[in-house]
From Swiss-Prot:
It is found in: Virion membrane; Host membrane. PROSITE patterns: IG_LIKE (PS50835). InterPro entries: Ig-like_dom (IPR007110), Ig-like_dom_sf (IPR036179), Ig-like_fold (IPR013783), Ig_sub (IPR003599), Ig_V-set (IPR013106). Glycosylated; contains phosphate and sulfate-substituted glycans. O-glycosylation is required for hemagglutination and hemadsorption activities of infected cell membranes. Disulfide bonds join 36-105. Pfam families: V-set. Belongs to the orthopoxvirus OPG185 family. This is Protein OPG185. Residues 302-313 are intravirion. Residues 1-16 form the signal peptide.
Length: 313
């Protein structure tokens, strides 16, 4: 009856999916030793077994008797059970790519105190990885749970807009016209880069304008005007750089100014310290008024009693 229970339990274990606890990495041609130890050392081990997922039984062992299944032999897989059946070990020789997979060992135990047919078991799994390259052998002991690296995102210190609001009005310059004797070159500028950096102490705005060139002659004219505006809390600095055309014509040009308006509004918030100061000043004023009232009352009362005493005499 006990053997039948063990057989049925083994069949159910073969088709179950235990979670791997140990991972071993080896190269092709090496030998891999897989071992597991049981936690329950009080019960009697009736039989131990090794099988390979998904449904391949390798061997059944009872003491020194080993029975192999599914074309496995002792020449390929050797079995050992040292330390009085506390540990069971198999050694897979001359590894090939087909030997990779998850191997599971199971202990079938019965209680030594109760005369029952109840069978208890423990199972442990090992994942064997067979590397096809010439890398060194690595044995990795895993805890059974996946671990992903921690990531953290930090917000830059200069982005802090909780106490201010910033409004920009940018007027792009109008067309630039170069008047020459025999030709007219019209250059249109459009704003293409607006970069704003806001800090707790200052705000800066960079405006760079460039655009296409409309040429009515057969020669190439290159004319680039860029504006860089830096706005701080106290001043605005505007820099203009102009590159002349390919013929080095230094004709005067008219450029509409770039208007940048920077409006900063700070909304102050009262802290607890400010409220404490206000409350302290108010309390001091009230106490001073009470003290003055008490002194005045005492003086007036003293004079009144003195006056009544003199009248009685």
């Amino acid at each position: 009856m006990t053997r039948l229970s063990i057989l049925l339990l083994l069949i159910s274990l073969v088709y179950s999916t235990p979670y791997p606890q140990t991972q071993i990495s080896k190269k092709i041609g090496d030998d891999a030793t897989l071992s597991c130890s049981r936690n329950n050392i009080n019960d009697y081990v009736v039989m131990s077994a090794w099988y390979k997922e998904p449904n391949s039984i390798i061997l059944l062992a009872a003491k020194s008797d080993v029975l192999y299944f599914d074309n496995y032999t002792k020449d390929k897989i050797s079995y050992d059970s040292p330390y009085d059946d506390l540990v069971t070990t198999i050694t897979i020789k001359s590894l090939t790519a087909k030997d990779a997979g998850t191997y599971v060992c199971a202990f079938f135990m019965t209680s030594t105190t109760n005369d029952t047919d109840k069978v208890d078991y423990e199972e442990y799994s090992t994942e064997l990885i067979v590397n096809t390259d010439s890398e060194s052998t690595i044995d990795i002991i895993l805890s059974g749970s996946s671990h992903s690296p921690e990531t953290s995102s930090e917000k830059p210190d200069y982005i802090n807009n909780f106490n201010c609001s910033l409004v920009f009005e940018i007027a792009t310059p109008g067309p630039i016209t170069d008047n020459v004797e025999n030709h007219t070159d019209t250059v249109t500028y459009t704003s293409d880069i607006i970069n704003t950096v806001s800090t707790s102490s200052r705000e800066s705005t960079t405006v760079k304008t460039s655009g296409p060139i409309t040429n009515k002659e057969d020669h190439t004219v290159t004319d680039t005007v860029s504006y860089t505006t830096v706005s701080t809390s106290s001043e605005i600095v505007t820099t203009k750089s102009t590159a002349n055309d390919a013929h080095n014509d230094n004709e005067p040009s008219t450029v509409s100014p770039t208007t940048v308006k920077n409006i900063t509004k700070s909304i102050g918030k009262y802290s607890t310290k400010d409220y404490v100061k206000v409350f302290g000043i108010a309390a001091l004023i009230i106490l001073s008024a009470v003290a003055i009232f008490c002194i005045t009352y005492y003086i007036c009362n003293k004079r009144s009693r003195k006056y009544k005493t003199e009248n009685k005499v």
